[in-house]
Amino acid sequence: MNSPGLRKPTIWRPLLLLFPLLALLLSMSSPRLPDEVMLHITPLHQGMTLPDGFYIYQRLNERGIAIKSITPENNSIIVRLSSPEQSGAAKEILSIALPNTVVIAQRTHGTIRVARS
């Protein structure tokens, strides 16, 4: 009662073994974009104004924080940093320089709230 299909070697078994290996190799070789950190600055209370981007640039630049861009957006300011490692220092600097604001640090790949003041 043995089926002839069970005795013959099938091509499926090697393919099932090679597929995970191929998937692993492709995921490791794909180019990865570096993580980018954004600081999202909003007023603490509705109706309060935010400083202009140049003021924010001056505060961060004088402390050596490299900035990619500063963009106003819907009563908030988005600051993109050149180095994700500087996000903690930048958040601390802005929390002191802008006491009436909320500063949230976010990573662009899977938004993660890093810190909040």
Curated annotation (Swiss-Prot):
Topology term for the membrane: Single-pass membrane protein
Range of residues in the leader sequence: none
Superkingdom of the source species: Bacteria
Gene Ontology MF, one: protein kinase binding
Membrane topology (Periplasmic): 30-117
Pfam families in UniProt: SecD-TM1
Coiled coil ranges: none
Keyword Transmembrane set for record: yes
Subcellular location: Cell inner membrane
Transmembrane stretches, start-end: 10-29
Entry keywords, A to Z: Cell inner membrane, Cell membrane, Membrane, Transmembrane, Transmembrane helix
InterPro entries noted in UniProt: Modulator_MzrA (IPR026574), SecD-TM (IPR027398)
All ranges on the Cytoplasmic side of the membrane: 1-9
GO CC term (a single one): plasma membrane
Cross-referenced HAMAP family: Modulator_MzrA (MF_00904)
Family in the record: Belongs to the MzrA family.
Purpose: Modulates the activity of the EnvZ/OmpR two-component regulatory system, probably by directly modulating EnvZ enzymatic activity and increasing stability of phosphorylated OmpR.
Name of this chain's protein: Modulator protein MzrA
Source organism of the structure: Dickeya zeae (strain Ech586) (Dickeya dadantii (strain Ech586))
